[in-house]
């Protein structure tokens, strides 16, 4: 168990827009992009053959699209991120409204085979005794409703243009 619940910089959601594409490009997980979104597969390929395929086919397309997007401005990068009060209840993670303490969402995560761990096991139980000063900084209504931990979330989008361009 953690020695204390980490205090987030804020509760709720924030949005960042107008991000610099050149900066963002450095953080793209290209392997996930090429395999998960673009459909490239390493199946049956050696490490060297896979690398050659990526360098010959995928990377030039990525660089061309990045250059076009920067010149034409058709990508609209946006990041939504936030922190929410949460608590574990049985096999579910409850997400509370920072303003009202109402349960906004319940998430059920799979458990590892053989009764192993689940992501929910890493969160504090509902109405657990505080580990530190979280009763002082946790949103009051959420704390009263049993929130004893914090969940950080993020969502990244590039807008609708990439899908339209890919289908063209």
Task: Enumerate the predicted regions with their spans.
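Active-site loops and adjacent core secondary-structure elements that bind or stabilize anionic groups
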Residues: 1-168
């Amino acid at each position: 168990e953690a020695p204390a619940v980490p205090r987030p910089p804020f509760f709720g959601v924030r949005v960042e827009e107008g991000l610099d594409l050149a900066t963002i490009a450095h953080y793209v997980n290209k392997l996930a992009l090429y395999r998960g979104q673009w459909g490239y597969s390493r199946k049956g390929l050696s490490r060297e053959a896979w690398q050659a395929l990526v360098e010959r086919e995928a990377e030039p397309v990525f660089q061309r699209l990045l250059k076009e997007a920067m010149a034409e401005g058709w990508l609209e990068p946006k990041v939504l991120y936030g922190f929410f009060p949460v608590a574990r209840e049985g096999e579910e993670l409850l997400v509370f409204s920072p303003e009202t303490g109402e349960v906004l969402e319940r998430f059920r995560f799979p458990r590892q085979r053989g009764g192993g761990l689940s992501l929910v096991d890493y969160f504090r139980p509902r109405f657990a005794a505080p580990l530190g000063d979280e009763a002082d900084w946790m949103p009051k209504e959420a704390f009263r409703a049993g929130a004893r931990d914090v969940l950080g979330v993020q969502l990244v989008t590039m807008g609708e243009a990439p899908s339209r361009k890919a289908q063209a």
